[in-house]
Amino acid sequence: MPTNLNALLRYKIIDECLSNDQLSCTIDVLIEKCTQKLSEFQGVYSVSERTIRNDIRILRSDALGFNSPIVVNQGVYSYSESGYSIFG
């Protein structure tokens, strides 16, 4: 499991974004969405690009058992499998 609540919330937000076929998930969009949600729930006002890239790396890996099929095409991140979710 993630080492802290903020990481778990970011994973959930990233998963929601990548699961949404109508959203073009660039790094900037993921940063914006994570910052917005975390500021609402946790009072965190900024999430760095490095943090999001590291989260994506962790979600792709088997380190925490996610092994998510995340692909990037021209800077847009998505799941390679339609309807995929790490929480569903």
Task: Tell me the role of every PLM-derived stretch.
Residues 1-88:
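Short, basic/aromatic recognition patches that contact phosphate-bearing ligands
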